Amino acid sequence: MKYGVKYEIDQSIPNDLPDFPFIDEKDYPSERWEITLKDQDTIIFSFNFLYIGKFLNEIKRYCKNRIITFETNIPKENNFYLLYHFIIWKNKNNWCEDSKVLIFKNSMIFIFCETRIKIDIDNNEIIIKSNPKTDTTLELKMSKFLENLKEKPLQVKNYYYFFTILSKVSNSVLINDDGFDIWIYSLEYPLFIIAKNGTGKTRFLKKVFTNSGILKCKQSIYLNEFMVLSFSNGVNNEEVKFFEEFLNVYKAHSMLSTLNNKGFLTKYIWNSINEVLKSNNLPFSLLPSDLKSDRLLFKMDDVTLYYHDLSSGEKTLFIVFALIVFYQDNYSGIADEEVLLLLDEIETTLHAQSLRVLFNAIHKQRNNLKIIMSTHNSTSLRIASEYGFHYYLLEKSLTISDGNSVKIKELKSHENAISYVSDGMLSVVDSSKLVFVEDDDDSKFYEIAYKKLFNYPHTTRLVFCNAGIKNNSQHDLNQVSLILKKMDGNDENVKSIQKLINTLKETNTIGGKTSVKEKVKLLSEKSVTEESFRLGNSQIIGLLDKDDGKNEGEFLITIDYYSYEMFLCSPLVLFYMIKNEFLKTSPDSHLSTITTTTPSSQEINTNLSQQDMVCFVIEKLIEKEVETKNRETNKTWKEYLDIFYEGIRSTTLFDVKLENQAIIKVPEIFINGFGKKGKGHNLFDTLVRIFAFGLNMQESTEKLKIKTLEAFEKMSTDNIPSCLRDTFLKVMNYSLKKITNNNNNNNNNNNNNKIKN
């Protein structure tokens, strides 16, 4: 690896420089520094980042009057980050008070604290590390210091953000090979690289592949569409190393399986791969080899197939899934994020649903793999925003004299990326949608759930709004009605006003599906065309409880559960509520039975599977049955309690798929509730009576809402039913589908008219 800039610095210090803000020694206690000198006359330091402070204090003890050469990979002219090179020199023993800033030509020198510093001396013979704490007062000190400088390094209002930018440059690297320079800045994974034709996307990916160490990866894999379709390359043996390793393991496992292996393996490679294929609803599975050839064998609908029999999309998904499984099973010694996966336009053959399968798999591996993809497909860029992808533009550098150099910069959104690859022909404006829900409680829940599941910078933003009116507005309507009744009932104006008031009370209740439908109809009554879509008319969606299952309609989407409360009544949410709240309950409380038999928090976290959590909650609810029924005096609710407890003991169980692809079995009552009306509300109100957090029903209801919502917010996303993510995705993508459908209908109508004419 070659470095971009070299400095030679002597020890002369100008006298007219402003004092540098000191850092309190007590905030950064002394640490041991070790330096090995390779040359008694010159020390060469290779930096990924210039951390200055006590480091130079130690250097001076060794260097005395010798010349020090700093060699760094940070470019002199860097318009992307507007970075100036910096160094601080220590003149006296008490460096905290007398530190000076040395200014060179076109260079400014600063000091600030980085949480992780790694400095390689010469050829990585020795490493010096420091881990100082962050200093919240540094922002103020630095801002005062910058005000005294004659030449301002960067015009920014928020100096703390400026230092964050400098910190990110620590990840910048320079690839220099055969006269091809690539400047890479801080990257966030997974990511898409886009570029115009001729810029060098493929060349860039191959350079990264051959220099994977620059992105701190021990292993890199490069795949393009040709390699995926043929399961070979024939040009670069290094690029097909993964295929060779995979086939070797596949053949070895196949041979062991024919020997009735009983001790060497507990799981064959096809078992692991088939689990992933099945969880993603792919129609084929991998079989053991017949040992007569090196070819992969598959099964689809009881028919044996070879790799070349699969469709191009099936090949793409198989290769990616096989790769992920292979490295998880065979390279467990490689730490997280030390495997780099480079995918060069491999997704172009996939339709939208298959793209979601691919991106969802990548999303789930975001903590285990660094994944870089290149594409020119606007559909890929749009869908990837739902799965946490970042977007980077590869372009030729204007700041580096070599015309064969390129640089990468991050794009703000998937809309920018789509506009770029389409040369401005496509303009995407669905970055946010207004979603009407039935009441304030729905709005709070969906807001929390959406942020938990889609906390990405480039995804469609959903804004949830209660479609009903406020309590005081409903009260005002009632008061107006009472006044009107006292007036002359024969007056036609009074009758008209009374009729209007009644209509408002019916359609603008405090929440409810009628309010949602009315609001959506009112705001989305125009026909959905390409023009109206750009104007935002199709950006308003209604999200309704399942209720009687008759809520679907224009701009309306129904959740899979009877009501949102069903998500909060989930046994997994109740488990975390018990974990968080019941352990704090005093022994004399009516909850003492659960308290005394509940494992410690640590035991709950480490020993219970998701299915065990369900069983745990049901067991604890049953323990409270007698006590709860004895407390209840209302006849109707005594009957409801009987129905509830009969329901949780039922052997009729429903499969619930979770975010981590696990499937748990729960009693039907947790999915559909019970009772002729208000099924979800009946379930929640039953839990209110069982847990009885307050002194009365109203207080207990409010407290249970708060506690279940807190438990939902704090628990892992792995425990959320996957149908909730699917519902949000329906909302995000609704407008695009409507435009397509309506445009097709319009075209069909036009064609019909032409035929008639």
UniProtKB/Swiss-Prot annotation:
Pfam families: AAA_21. Transmembrane segments: none annotated. InterPro entries: ATPase_AAA_core (IPR003959), P-loop_NTPase (IPR027417). Gene3D superfamilies: P-loop containing nucleotide triphosphate hydrolases. GO terms for molecular function: ATP binding; ATP hydrolysis activity. This is Uncharacterized protein DDB_G0284767. It comes from Dictyostelium discoideum (Social amoeba).
